[in-house]
C-alpha cells in the first residue's frame, strides 16, 4: 500500500490501539513464562513479556509475510516455556541467572528451528500437525500453570506451600482470592459480552480497579503483593552473553535434552499458531499471507527476543485485527505499537510496579 498522510494517520491510531490490546497479553504471558521463579521475581517475567512485545514484534513485523503483522507472547508457547523453566527452578544447582540464560537459549533455538522450517519451505506442512495432539499437550501444561497460580490467588508465598503440612493455611488472604476470582470472572464476561474488546485488558483494568477500591476499605495486610519495580533501562542484547559458560556447566548439561525438546515444541506450536493467525488476518484484510516468509520472520523475531531477554513470540491476530479496525494498514502500525510499549516500560515503570499479582493470576486462570 502506498503511504499517504491519511494512511500514516491510520497507522498511528492503529498502532496505539494495538499497543493497548497487546499490553495485557505481554504482562500476563511474560509472567506465565517465568512464573516458576516465584512471585518475588514477578517483575522479571513482566519485563520479559514487554521486551518480547517490543523487540520481537519489531523484528518479526519488519520481515513478515502478513498484511498487518503484530507479534507478541502467546498462551500456547509461553505455557511450554513456563514448563521448561519450572524444570530448571526445581534443580537447586541452577541459580536465577543460569535459569534466565537457559530460558533465553531455548527461545533462541526455537527461533532458529522456525527459520529452518521457513527456509526449507515447510510452512504448508506445519498445518498438518494433528490438532488433538496439540490440544492434549497444551491442556496438560495449562493445568500445571493454573496450579502454579494458587499461591498468587491465595496470597501465600509459594515456598510456604512446598512442605507436606498445612501450616500455610493460616497465611491465606481471602481478599486476595476475591480479587483474583473477580478478575477471572470479568475476563470471561468481557469475552462473551464484548468480543471485540481485548478481554484480558478489560480484566486487567477491572481487577486493578477492584483491588485498589477494596484497599480503601480493608487493611493493606489483607492483600497479596504487587509486581514491584521493573529492572530499569533500555533493553540491551546481552541476555545470551553468559550462555557459553552456563551451557558448559555440569548443572546445565543435564537439562540440554529438555532444552532442545522444549525449543522444538515452541517452534512447531508457534509456527502453527502464527500461520493460523495469518489466515485469520487474511480473512479480515482480504489479502493472502506468505507462509514460509512468515516462519522466517517469526524465527528472527524469537531470536531477537532471546537476545534481549524476552519470552517466545508468535503472530497475534487479535491485536493485528484490532489495529486494522482502528485504521492501521501497513507494518508501521506494528512499529508504533512497539514504540508505545517501550515508552510505557521506560516512563510508566512506577505505575506498572503497582499492578497486583492477584489480578494477573486471575487473568492467567482463564486466558
Residue spans of the language-model regions?
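Transmembrane helical cores of multi-pass ion-transport proteins
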Residues: 1-367
Amino acid at each position: 500500500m502506498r503511504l499517504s498522510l491519511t494512511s500514516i494517520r491510520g497507522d498511528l491510531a492503529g498502532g496505539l490501539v494495538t499497543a493497548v490490546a497487546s499490553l495485557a497479553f505481554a504482562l500476563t504471558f511474560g509472567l506465565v513464562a517465568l512464573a516458576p521463579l516465584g512471585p518475588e521475581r514477578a517483575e522479571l517475567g513482566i519485563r520479559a513479556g514487554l521486551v518480547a512485545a517490543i523487540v520481537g514484534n519489531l523484528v518479526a513485523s519488519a520481515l513478515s509475510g502478513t498484511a498487518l503483522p503484530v507479534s507478541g507472547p502467546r498462551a500456547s508457547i509461553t505455557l511450554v516455556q513456563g514448563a521448561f523453566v519450572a524444570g530448571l527452578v526445581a534443580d537447586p544447582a541452577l541459580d536465577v541467572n543460569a535459569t534466565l540464560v537457559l530460558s533465553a537459549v531455548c527461545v533462541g533455538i526455537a527461533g532458529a528451528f522456525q527459520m529452518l522450517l521457513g527456509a526449507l519451505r515447510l510452512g504448508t506442512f506445519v498445518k498438518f500437525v494433528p490438532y488433538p495432539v496439540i490440544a492434549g499437550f497444551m491442556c496438560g501444561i495449562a493445568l500445571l500453570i493454573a496450579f502454579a497460580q494458587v499461591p498468587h490467588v491465595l496470597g501465600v508465598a509459594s515456598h510456604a506451600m512446598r512442605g507436606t503440612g498445612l501450616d500455610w493455611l493460616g497465611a491465606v488472604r481471602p481478599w486476595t482470592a476475591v480479587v483474583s476470582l473477580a478478575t477471572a470472572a470479568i475476563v470471561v464476561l468481557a469475552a462473551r459480552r464484548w468480543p471485540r474488546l481485548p478481554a484480558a485488558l478489560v480484566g486487567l483494568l477491572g481487577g486493578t480497579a477492584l483491588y485498589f477500591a477494596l484497599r480503601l476499605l480493608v487493611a493493606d495486610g489483607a492483600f497479596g503483593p504487587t509486581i514491584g519495580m521493573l529492572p530499569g533501562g533500555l533493553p540491551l542484547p546481552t541476555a545470551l552473553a553468559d550462555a557459553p559458560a552456563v551451557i558448559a556447566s555440569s548443572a546445565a548439561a543435564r537439562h540440554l535434552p529438555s532444552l532442545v525438546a522444549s525449543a522444538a515444541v515452541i517452534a512447531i506450536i508457534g509456527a502453527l499458531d502464527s500461520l493460523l493467525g495469518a489466515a485469520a488476518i487474511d480473512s479480515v484484510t482480504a489479502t493472502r499471507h506468505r507462509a514460509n516468509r512468515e516462519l522466517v520472520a517469526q524465527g528472527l523475531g524469537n531470536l531477537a527476543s532471546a537476545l534481549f531477554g524476552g519470552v517466545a513470540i508468535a503472530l497475534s491476530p487479535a491485536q493485528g485485527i484490532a489495529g486494522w479496525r482502528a485504521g492501521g494498514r501497513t507494518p508501521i502500525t506494528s512499529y508504533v505499537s512497539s514504540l508505545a510499549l517501550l515508552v510505557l516500560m521506560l516512563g510508566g515503570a512506577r505505575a506498572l510496579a503497582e499492578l497486583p499479582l492477584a489480578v494477573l493470576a486471575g487473568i492467567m486462570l482463564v486466558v
